[in-house]
């Protein structure tokens, strides 16, 4: 069988709840963020209502990916909430960093510094995050700003269906 055929068989063997999450992941990969968020919300609702035994890893990864979708739409408050919930489920360095980056982007430097202190972020991780934030903030604007804005607007409408 082809690898595609095997992938489809493996997909079909997954529980319905896992297939829904995979669909959300696929939509994020293809920049269909609003649809992905809706699928993730349905998946979380199904997980709660059906008391599925998928565990905190599964729930945390849904919240993380939903946070990424919201962040891609520049809806940082929603992203922040999702990343916080993801970190509560996952308790990983990566999930903590995503949450702290969202704090920085939505609430600013002071809130970020305060949260790093509250969460007792170690010095090495803090330096690494500060460096990544500095790099992320060094954006070069395109030479033809009008053309770039038109392209970005077109891309946003394509990704949101608006």
Regions found by a protein language model. Give the residues of each.
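"A position-specific structural signal for the A-helix of alpha-solenoid helical repeats
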Residues: 15, 22, 58, 65, ...
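Terminal, low-structured helical/coil segments at or just beyond the last alpha-helical repeat
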Residues: 114-162
